[in-house]
């Protein structure tokens, strides 16, 4: 049987927008060098918005089971001890999964006003460790969003010739599924829903997206003969989710470029054709991929038209530019590009 465990840790619904990320890190820390790792999580952070759920997950490899370390998130201590939720031995090494609930930290006034989520790890004793990957799941509370989710997490080693199956995978029969896995070297894996099979090659950290045909039954199997000679393959988590979100949709209703002295003034009318107001909005002027100008604008309400203008110096003026309209809502960022010819202005 596969070593390790995968457990259901959450099933439910909330008025919140869900965001998750899993990133390969591969950073080594040793006590002899007084190692300290600083890492900024690649997570959108709407200012002033409380979190409904926030879970930090670390995948750590070591030669020894005893490690002394401290973990902080946004300057607040998360753990002063190395206490993995799951540990699996692979050859001479151990792979550990550490799971932290950091909701209370992100809901402090200091964290709610920070645009980034920052983590530090200080190695204070024991053997060398390798931080293999970082995972983060966060749900931002708001009446414009509604999420249903079921989340399994842990650390499961599926060896050669082994298989692992799950039933009742999804939060409902119409949700999507994300299977998070890890393998140091390429490994062929077969996924089955009982009637169809999907063969994939996994290398490194992989987020495998599955449709709702896998909701009733999911089987994960490894090719091989139980010789143990191949690369290890781990299942780190499985997330089933269904989201509904009222979204803003910004459009450039009109564009009027006019020359004025030593610059070109572009007058714009921006409309919101969606059903929600953005948290933030901005205009970006691009010339062949280079940013020439950035301007924050008033986020328009649904149906509202906002008038704005942006200026480009003549000495920077190309034949044409791209106007990028960017807007953010909770954990999501969208943009729309429009080309503007300036040669005849």
Residue spans of the language-model regions?
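Hydrophobic beta-strand positions in extracellular immunoglobulin-like domains
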Residues: 269-272, 312, 327
């Amino acid at each position: 049987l596969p070593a390790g465990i995968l457990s259901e840790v959450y099933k439910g619904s909330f008025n919140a927008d869900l965001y998750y990320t899993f990133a390969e890190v591969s950073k080594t820390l040793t006590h002899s060098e007084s190692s300290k790792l600083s890492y900024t999580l690649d997570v959108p952070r709407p200012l002033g918005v409380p979190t409904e759920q926030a879970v930090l997950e670390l995948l750590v490899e070591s030669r020894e089971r005893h490690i002394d370390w401290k973990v902080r998130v946004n300057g607040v201590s998360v753990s002063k001890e190395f206490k993995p939720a799951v540990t699996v031995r692979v050859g001479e090494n151990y792979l550990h999964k550490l799971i932290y609930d950091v909701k209370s930290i992100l809901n402090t006034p200091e964290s709610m006003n920070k645009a980034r989520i920052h983590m530090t790890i200080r190695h204070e004793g024991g053997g060398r460790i390798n931080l293999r990957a970082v995972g983060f799941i966060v749900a931002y509370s708001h009446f414009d969003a509604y999420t249903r989710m079921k989340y399994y997490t842990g650390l499961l080693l599926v060896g050669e010739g082994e298989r692992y199956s799950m039933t009742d995978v999804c939060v409902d029969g119409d949700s999507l599924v994300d299977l998070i896995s890890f393998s140091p070297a390429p490994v062929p894996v077969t996924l089955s829903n009982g009637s169809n099979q999907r063969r994939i090659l996994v290398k490194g950290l992989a987020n495998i997206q599955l449709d709702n045909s896998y909701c009733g039954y999911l089987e994960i199997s490894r090719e091989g003969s139980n010789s143990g000679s191949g690369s290890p393959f781990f299942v780190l988590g499985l997330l089933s989710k269904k989201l509904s979100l009222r979204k803003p949709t910004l459009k450039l209703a009109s564009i009027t470029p006019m020359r004025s002295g030593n610059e070109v003034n572009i007058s714009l009318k921006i409309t919101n054709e969606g059903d929600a107001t953005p948290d933030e909005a901005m205009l970006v002027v691009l010339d062949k991929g280079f940013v020439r100008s950035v301007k924050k604008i008033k986020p328009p309400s649904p149906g509202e038209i906002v008038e704005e203008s942006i200026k480009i110096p003549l000495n920077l003026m190309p034949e044409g530019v791209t106007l990028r309209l960017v807007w953010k809502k909770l954990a999501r960022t969208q943009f729309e590009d429009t080309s503007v010819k300036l040669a005849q202005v």
